[in-house]
């Protein structure tokens, strides 16, 4: 009685189990064809790994997490050429390894920072750091208001405080600038100096040249600011160290509008990675794959050598870093 109620028209339901496999296969094939057509219409003319129904972006992102940004960029440049299209966190990204064209890949996606209980300890740590920095700046401000000779107490923080007093900066600007110098400078500068010490140990003739120059320029006295322009060999050694073994070998930008780079269309919002580490190994340098001061015996155009980045988003502490490394 129940089967007759459910099937009042007496359809041949016994055939359904036999027909389902036969009908499923064409449907799956049709879906795959539709996916291929959809992917084909959106395929980019720029060389790079295929989209392949969303599998390509997952593999691309996984490679960056597994190999690291620098090694992954070098892999894609060697595999596909100087201009490559890949994906970061689902976003289309271009890697450009030549001179015409830096936290680059965050291991945590944006959604991580939108879930309060996941990033609570990071927010608290940031507040503690900011609070400690504000206390130090206020102590510096109080000290400047009581000293008799300002010349003896002028430094980076003092200049920022005076700029605030003139109305050029806000208190938040001063706090942020000092905080960035404290966070960004120690890591990159210390690693750069570490690499320089290794290169000095490996190249004793370069060490001898620098020592002779230092003795000629300064003698037995301490280094002064006027000595910096005269330390040419030391400067070339610093440049060559940053070229041969860069601490930061990538620069990342986001296209603010549709553009064309070297004939390739770039859509607004696309991430663009400039592979500086590879750019510094071009044939422009006499010995691009060797550590040699000959690479900087002649003036190097800025488009071939960008250790601190470029433009308004370049490293704000590059001049301070050069003085500190020379000293």
Curated annotation (Swiss-Prot):
Coiled coil segments of this chain: none
Pfam families named among the record's database cross-references: p450
UniProt GO BP: female gonad development; lipid metabolic process; response to estradiol
Bilayer disposition of the protein: Peripheral membrane protein
InterPro entries assigned to the protein according to its UniProt record, in alphabetical order: Cyt_P450, Cyt_P450_B, Cyt_P450_CS, Cyt_P450_sf, Cytochrome_P450_Monoox
EC numbers on record: 1.14.14.14
Any one of the GO CC terms: endoplasmic reticulum
Record flagged with keyword Magnesium: no
Keyword Transport: no
Cofactor(s) it depends on: heme
SUPFAM superfamilies noted in UniProt: Cytochrome P450 (SSF48264)
Record key words, sorted: Heme, Iron, Lipid metabolism, Membrane, Metal-binding, Monooxygenase, Oxidoreductase
Main location as per UniProt: membrane
GO function terms (MF aspect): aromatase activity; heme binding; iron ion binding
Enzyme's top EC category: oxidoreductase
Residues the record lists as binding heme: 315
Catalytic activity: testosterone + 3 reduced [NADPH--hemoprotein reductase] + 3 O2 = 17beta-estradiol + formate + 3 oxidized [NADPH--hemoprotein reductase] + 4 H2O + 4 H(+); androst-4-ene-3,17-dione + 3 reduced [NADPH--hemoprotein reductase] + 3 O2 = estrone + formate + 3 oxidized [NADPH--hemoprotein reductase] + 4 H2O + 4 H(+)
Compartments reported by the entry: Membrane
Family classification: Belongs to the cytochrome P450 family.
Biological role stated in the UniProt entry: Catalyzes the formation of aromatic C18 estrogens from C19 androgens.
Name of the protein this chain belongs to: Aromatase
Higher taxonomy: Eukaryota, Metazoa, Chordata, Craniata, Vertebrata
Gene: CYP19A1
